[in-house]
UniProtKB/Swiss-Prot annotation, chain C:
This is Trafficking protein particle complex subunit 2-like protein. SUPFAM superfamilies: SNARE-like (SSF64356). It comes from Taeniopygia guttata. It holds the Pfam family Sedlin_N. The gene is TRAPPC2L. Gene3D superfamilies: 3.30.450.70. May play a role in vesicular transport from endoplasmic reticulum to Golgi.
Length: 147, 196, 139
């Protein structure tokens, strides 16, 4: 059980933050491209999920999984999107994402008057605290060799 | 005979909760009088710096806007409110949750326009203006204009362009403070070029 | 009911004087001014004893043939002086104390007004209303 990486996007598509822990192979394209690809996919998935939903939807797109990993997604009404990739052993990372948003991002980045809103996160404190939090999660373990 | 500061019974405590960053995070209380005095000092310093009531009003609005774009994230994180479906729901959330959370008051919502795109918030008491009396040379000053900026900035971050202004103010002799909010349009997502 | 109420700053200049209008105002101003000496005397007498419970109310400063003058000093050395008609014997000490307490509360409210600079003359409508309620109703 492990956590691969985390992305934070804002509404216009820019990636504000990226951090990885156990990523075995990269995508083979430059990081800018990777962010654009990720955002584009999320956007399409979101609108697809909304259109195809058989009943009224509250949260919309929450997660998807493949045979190798699971992607968890949290979107705030203010347009902030948090994406966490974990391995298949993690059923839901919603609380973790909410904690990262409410207690780390809002407290350390949003409330910092020196961080302009919607700009890439430079805050070292945020990175450290996030790292400490992610490592403290019960499903963060050493990378399973099979994955 | 010892003398009590007789205003102790009236001072309202505002509760600001620290989230659980660490297990020893505690409840922090702040006296609302300190907040009122801080805001008053801010406004009077702006008056001294700008000397012109209109400029002060504009600055307060700008400052409020900067606060609003950040405050909305804190509000969403703490209150867990999802997207509002229409303007009426937005009005309810603003009056019953947001004002209560940040200022400790619950304004009432009245005067809906027939099209449902304008309404008024009536504040019986405004904690920003406790003890304040506007002198005669600042009759056009909108003392609590910061609130207008905050509301405008916060709603802009959730894709609503609104116009917010004071129509009645207890400092100017009216019986209540009334804020009029008008929905202008929805701000659409604009995608970066090359997407879809 | 008071005949004249004055608020004097720490440096002994008046921040606010209001008296019943039909009387000779100058006489009241003079009375208040001379009473300041008595106030200073009382303050210095108290200061030496260093009591742990500083009494803010000074009591009767001195009686003249028509009037009685009462004093009150705050911890920041702002003094309130009240001139009361001698013929009004119904006024007891407790009432005078409560009137001073109201004055003190209104004064602190003025200090909290961000537009008021300490040391300025007092121009507050709320303070005026409160003082008017304490002055004698002269028709």
């Amino acid at each position: 059980m492990t956590i691969h990486n985390l992305y934070i996007f804002e509404r216009g598509g820019r990636c504000l933050f990226y951090s990885e822990w156990h990523r075995r192979r990269g995508p083979g394209i430059p990081q800018e491209e990777e962010f654009k690809l990720m955002f584009g996919m999320l956007f399409s998935l979101r609108s697809f999920v909304a259109k195809m939903s058989p009943t009224d939807m509250r949260d919309g797109f929450v997660a998807f999984h493949t045979s190798k990993y699971r992607l968890h997604y949290l979107e705030t009404p203010s347009g902030l999107r948090l994406v966490l990739n974990t391995d298949l052993g993690v059923p839901s990372a919603r609380e973790a994402l909410q904690h990262i948003y409410g207690n780390l991002f809002v407290e350390l980045v949003v409330k910092n008057p020196l961080c302009p809103p919607r700009a890439p996160v430079q805050s070292l404190l945020f990175r450290q605290r996030l790292d400490a939090f992610v490592r403290s999660l019960p499903y963060f373990g050493p990378r399973n060799p099979q994955n | 005979m010892s003398r009590q500061g007789g205003r102790g019974t009236e001072s309202k405590k505002m509760y600001w909760y620290l989230p659980f960053i660490s297990p020893s995070a505690s409840l922090q209380l702040m006296n609302s009088e300190l907040f009122t005095l801080t805001y008053g000092a801010l406004v009077t310093q702006l008056c001294k710096d700008y000397e012109n009531d209109d400029d002060v009003n504009k600055q307060l609005d700008k400052m409020g806007y900067n606060i609003g774009v950040r405050l909305i994230e804190d509000f969403l994180a703490r209150s867990n409110v999802g997207r509002c479906h229409d303007f009426r729901e937005t009005a309810d959330v603003i009056a019953k949750i947001a004002f209560k959370m940040y200022l400790g008051i619950t304004p009432s919502i009245t005067n809906w326009s027939p099209g449902g795109d304008e309404f008024s918030l009536i504040l019986e008491n405004n904690p920003l203006v406790d003890f304040v009396e506007l002198p005669d040379n600042h009759s056009t000053l909108i003392y609590s204009n910061l609130l207008c900026g905050v509301l405008r900035g916060a709603l802009e971050m959730v894709q609503m362009a609104v116009d917010v202004k004071f129509v009645q103010d207890t400092l100017k002799g009216d019986s209540v403070t009334e804020i009029r909010m008008k929905f202008i349009r929805r701000i659409e997502d604009n995608l970066p070029a090359g997407e879809e | 009911m008071a005949v004249c109420i004055a608020v004097i700053a720490k440096e002994n200049y008046p921040l606010y004087i209001r008296s019943v209008p039909t009387e000779n105002e100058l006489k009241f101003h003079y009375t208040v001014h001379t009473s300041l000496d008595v106030v200073d005397e009382k303050i210095s007498a108290m200061g030496k004893a260093l009591v742990d419970q500083r009494e803010l109310y000074l009591g009767l400063l001195y009686p003249t043939e028509d009037y009685k003058v009462y004093g009150y000093v705050t911890n920041s050395k702002v003094k309130f002086v009240m001139v009361v008609d001698s013929s009004n014997t119904a006024l007891r000490d407790n009432e005078i104390r409560s009137m001073f307490r109201k004055l003190h509360n209104s004064y602190t409210d003025i200090m909290c007004n961000p537009f008021y600079n300490p040391g300025d003359r007092i121009h507050s409508r709320a303070f005026d209303t409160m003082v008017n309620s304490m002055m004698m109703q002269v028709c």
